[in-house]
Every structure is written in C-alpha cells, then in structure tokens.
Amino acid sequence: MLRIAGRKLSSSAAARSSSAFFTRNPFTFTDDSSSPTRSPSPTSLASQFLDQFRGFSSNSVSPAHQTGLVSDLPATVAAIKNPSSKIVYDDSNHERYPPGDPSKRAFAYFVLTGGRFVYASLVRLLILKFVLSMSASKDVLALASLEVDLSSIEPGTTVTVKWRGKPVFIRRRTDEDINLANSVDLGSLRDPQQDAERVKNPEWLVVIGVCTHLGCIPLPNAGDFGGWFCPCHGSHYDISGRIRKGPAPYNLEVPTYSFMEENKLLIG
C-alpha cells in the first residue's frame, strides 16, 4: 500500500511540473508539425534573465536585520561576509569611554594655553616688525636734520648749506640790515609779513634758497633791495627774504629751525 501511494504522489508531482513548464514556456506547438509557432526573441530572454538577477541581487544586499543571515555577527564581520552597497549601522555598540584623569586634563589645558600665548606673541612681534620697517631709517633721519656751526660766519655775509636736497641761505645781518627790514611798509608788499615773524633771532635770517616763481636759485647780496635776485625771471627779494619786485608770488620760505647754543643752529 505504501508503494502504491508513493507512486501516485510522484506521478502527480511530475504532472504538475510538466504543466507548469508548458505554462511558463513561451513556445506553442501545433498538431501538424509539432514545431513552435514562434521563437523567443533574444531581448525577451535577456530581460527575463536580468529580472531574475536583479531580484537575486536585491535580496542578497538587503539589511542584516531583514535577511537574518548574519544577525549574530558584528557589523564589520557581516559587511565582509555579505558585501552590500547599503550602509549598515551597528545600533548595538554604544560604548562610552570613561572621563580622563583630572591631572592629564590640567596638563592639556596648560599646553593649549601656552601654545596660544606663544602664538599671540609671535603675531605681536610680526606686527611690530612690519610697523617699524615702515618708519624712516637712521640715515634718513640724519638727513632730515642739519646742524650748522655759526661761529665762522661774518656779519653781513651769507652762507649756503644743503638740507633735504635744497639750498638754505643763512645770513648774519648787521644792525643796518635789521633796521632796514623793519622800516618797510607792509602795505607795499605783495606777500605782507613782518620781519619779526620770519626770524627767531634778529641777527640771523634762515630761508630756503628756492625762488617761489619757478624754482630757480636766487643770487645773494644782489637785486634792487640788497637781498637776493633771481636771474631766471628777475624777481627781487629784500634783506628779510620778502618779494619786492618781479613775478614771484610769495616770500622765500622759512624752514623749521632752532638754536641749540649761541653759535649752533639745527635745521629740521
């Protein structure tokens, strides 16, 4: 009886498999030639193969908690044994490290504070170096001022010195020169200015020897007023360096100067 039941089960299973094959098989046969009425196209076969492959690949790269294949393995081991393009997160690993030693934290704070202090000091030095590099050098400062010895200048004479690339006239005036400079009517001057405003010591007159017209150098002890005469365009200056005649619009410029001693003059 058991053998007969087994044979019946095997025959029914074979019948179901054959019927399923003919159901899925795209080929149909006719009674006359027993040949298929149509042949499968390569594109249909390729599409069916790709569908099966995609389904297999999607199932193979599904997350670990869905497949259950590597549920008992760590995330790293599961990723090696079951390669997947999806990112699998290990939600079970929440290890927390204990806080560090207080002495080590204090040392770390000390190192960081020291590093910041050194960094700030270096930045400060760089800024100071940059600012100091923009200031004038000692040579330039030396040329900016000029010290002149007045002891060798005789009364009534004029000495020319060079300061900042320009000639400077230093005249030691006599009493007659001083009285003549103070007797001039300011209303008659083109650039009105009293003699006391142009000198710090009435005996000494210090002016820049450049004509205010076009920058020529006037000649001392010349002209119609006993001061300076510009040969370029005929400008006349008096004994105080004021313009009295000619095209020059202004008086000779007075530089910044001071008396260091009785016979020492510092220009600049």
Swiss-Prot record:
Mitochondrial matrix topological segments: 57-105
GO-annotated molecular function: 2 iron, 2 sulfur cluster binding; metal ion binding; oxidoreductase activity; ubiquinol-cytochrome-c reductase activity
E.C. number(s) listed in UniProt: 7.1.1.8
Cofactor: [2Fe-2S] cluster
Cofactor binding remark: Binds 1 [2Fe-2S] cluster per subunit.
Quaternary assembly: Component of the ubiquinol-cytochrome c oxidoreductase (cytochrome b-c1 complex, complex III, CIII), a multisubunit enzyme composed of 3 respiratory subunits cytochrome b, cytochrome c1 and Rieske protein, 2 core protein subunits, and several low-molecular weight protein subunits. The complex exists as an obligatory dimer and forms supercomplexes (SCs) in the inner mitochondrial membrane with cytochrome c oxidase (complex IV, CIV).
Note: The Rieske protein is a high potential 2Fe-2S protein.
Summary of the function given for this chain in its UniProt record: Component of the ubiquinol-cytochrome c oxidoreductase, a multisubunit transmembrane complex that is part of the mitochondrial electron transport chain which drives oxidative phosphorylation.
Name the record gives this protein: Cytochrome b-c1 complex subunit Rieske-5, mitochondrial
Natural source organism: Nicotiana tabacum (Common tobacco)
